[in-house]
Amino acid sequence: MPTVMTAARVRVPPTNEADYLATLRELCQFAEARGQRIWLFRNAKDPQLFTEFSESQTEMSHRAQASRLPEEIKLERRLQSLGTYAPDAWELWSEVSLAAPTEV
């Protein structure tokens, strides 16, 4: 089954950055407990622009789809109050295998 991911761009004002990072760090702990991964990258030319990559094994287990604990929902809402997410932030992407097809 292919891995599923989102690539969410978010603009975070400098005054919110420390809180944004702490909130995402806390959310990562919940994700890791479920076998999910979250990576964060900062744009090299625009220090207020970040991209959150969130990966899970299935669509239904992804943070954009899965039912979650109330604590996680609060953290997600907090993140959305600290930054401005791009409109396509929660589009799901599925992994494409580049392995050579096997002959039968």
Task: Give the positions of each predicted feature.
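An amphipathic, aromatic/His-enriched active-site/gating alpha helix that lines ligand/cofactor pockets
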Residues: 26-39, 55-91
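Short acidic/glycine-enriched loop/turn segments that link adjacent beta-strands
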Residues: 45-49
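Active-site-flanking beta-strand signature of metal-NTP-handling nucleotidyl enzymes
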Residues: 3-11, 51
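Short, surface-exposed ligand-recognition loops at beta-strand->loop->(often short) alpha-helix junctions
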Residues: 10-22
